[in-house]
Amino acid sequence: MKRAEMANKLIPLHLRKGRILDIGCGAYPFFLFNTSFSEKYGLDKAVQKGDFNASQKDRIHLKRYDIEQEDILPFDNGYFDVMTMLAVFEHIEPKRVVSLLKEIQRVLKPDGMFIMTTPASWTDTLLKFMAKLRLVSPVEIEEHKGTYTAQKIASMLKAGGFPKELIRYGYFECFMNIWVVARTSRQ
């Protein structure tokens, strides 16, 4: 899972003493199992039960939650140090993205970090072709509702309340995927 590795590399050590929320973590929260944080939380419509307890130290708090149906994230203001959305952005109806980003901004602590990954827009045709050959999941590709460039994501993050100067991005896997980091203001 290259996106989980990329997200892990982008998280500074000092933030790992706090809380992380992975939006769209899946029924099996792979990224949360493979990252080190004091408290780990995951949201996904596929979640079946409340917590994973590999050990008390690695406990992951999971909540069934559909970001396509809900408008408010079920957490208090400034609750998380880091929030992630790994290969989820493209599955959200584009008209809902900015309001979701405003919610992410609300739930992040001052100087908090939002990390996301998404396929680069130019890969859409390639991914559809690969899905026809069953090299990638056809169901997953059919569920894509939008394609994005890094610049478009940065613009949406700014509309969602993230300061332009605290947004950075790059590419991985031969420029096929985009990573984006947005910080909240220190206040």
Q: Where are the language model's segments positioned?
A:
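S-adenosyl-L-methionine-dependent methyltransferase catalytic module, highlighting the catalytic core
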Residues: 82-84, 93-109, 113-186
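Active-site loop signature of alpha/beta-hydrolase-fold enzymes
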Residues: 48, 70, 91, 121-124
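Hydrophobic adenine-recognition pocket in adenosine-nucleotide-binding enzymes
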Residues: 88
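Conserved N-terminal segment of class I S-adenosyl-L-methionine
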Residues: 1-76, 82-84, 98-101, 141, ...
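Alpha-helical hinge/cap motifs
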Residues: 77, 91-93
